Amino acid sequence: MSIEPIDRLAEIKQLLAACELPTTDISPSKSLLFFGCHSDAKLVGIVGLEIYGTVALLRSLAVDPARRKQGLGKSLVDFAEAHAASLGVESLYLLTTTADAFFSGLGYSPASREEAPSFIKNTSQFSGLCPASSAFMCKHL
């Protein structure tokens, strides 16, 4: 299964909603990129990047429930990290309410919300969509 850029917003929103992740801020944007993989023409996994120069927000990681525990989430994150690094991103940030252990296993560490770069603080994910109780994490590439 190959991972590639995707831009079909309805398909992206459908998988995010099925995984109970926010969709209200998904719209065409130069700074928001999505990558995904399909199986039998069905989107089964996605990950997003909001890129702001040397920092980026890793977001919207979603895997079809029937495809979980098969390494797809890790593959999507690895792909997103490599793509971000190829664009000059030095630090990736993320917010999660349920997957902090998963991301810790991939090298992400807890980060201070107060010390978040202003570009990250200004994202809709940071400023409103994700609750204050979300784990805020960072990985330096």
Where are these regions (language model features)?
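Conserved beta-strand in the GNAT
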Residues: 36, 42-50, 55-62
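Short amphipathic alpha-helix that is part of the acyltransferase structural core
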Residues: 1-25, 38, 134-136, 140
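Conserved GNAT acetyl-CoA-binding A-motif
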Residues: 82-98
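Conserved acetyl-CoA-binding loop-helix of GNAT-fold acetyltransferases
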Residues: 63, 69-82, 94
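Short, small/polar residue-rich loop motifs at catalytic or cofactor-binding pockets
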Residues: 29-31
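A generic "binding-loop/recognition-motif" signal
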Residues: 8, 54, 98-99
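Conserved active-site alpha-helix within GNAT-family acetyltransferase domains
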Residues: 97-123
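C-terminal "cap" of GNAT-fold acetyltransferases
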Residues: 116-141
